[in-house]
A protein has these predicted regions:
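Non-catalytic C-terminal accessory/binding modules of secreted extracellular proteins
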Residues: 9-159
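Proline-enriched interdomain boundary motifs that mark the N-terminal boundary
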Residues: 158-166
Length: 169
């Protein structure tokens, strides 16, 4: 985002995406997923070693970003990116689905929750800030080894529509 490190963009369906721990690699350290013109996810792997030793948990972190909030920061340098709780610019999506778990071991996937999926139908759900489903699920989140995470990504999955069936006599 601010040229801190290299991103690989996920835009097509792919399996076994390889993601080494952020502090343990000289290759790709995060994936970028475009959700809309202005919104995106950043996916990174954090391991409790080196500068991350004192993290409350480890695993895959999913950040939700909004260029409408981030771009003004680049020009004004005013730290207002997350000043409005209902309209934040860059924030974590905790695996627990509870925003209060950001600073706990329930934040990373699978982490203490054991949550291995982030889809339109999970908690937390893969949605835009306005609640629109993304159709871009991240599934089968798992450890490949001690410091590498693997996951599957699907692109532009159609939304599931359900009809209500009523029975009358």
């Amino acid at each position: 985002i601010a040229n801190w490190f290299d991103f690989d963009t996920l835009s097509t369906t792919s399996e076994n995406n390889f993601l080494p721990a952020l502090n343990n690699t000289d290759t790709t350290v995060a994936y970028y997923v475009e959700l809309s013109t202005n919104e995106f996810f950043v996916i990174e792997n954090r391991k409790k070693t080196g500068w991350d030793t004192y993290l409350p948990g480890e695993g895959l972190l999913i950040y939700h970003g909004d260029w409408n909030k981030i771009n003004p920061w680049f020009t004004s340098h005013s730290n207002t990116i997350n000043i409005t709780p209902s309209n934040r610019g860059y924030f974590l999506r905790p695996a627990s689905g509870n925003a209060g778990d950001v600073e706990t071991n329930r934040c990373p996937f699978p982490g203490a929750t054991g949550n291995t999926n982030f889809t339109d139908n999970t908690n937390p759900a893969s949605t835009l800030k306005n609640g629109t489903l993304t159709g871009k699920p991240i599934t089968n989140i798992r450890y490949d080894n001690d410091s590498v995470m693997l996951f599957n990504f699907m692109s532009n999955l159609p939304a599931v529509v359900t009809d209500t069936v009523s029975t009358s006599s």
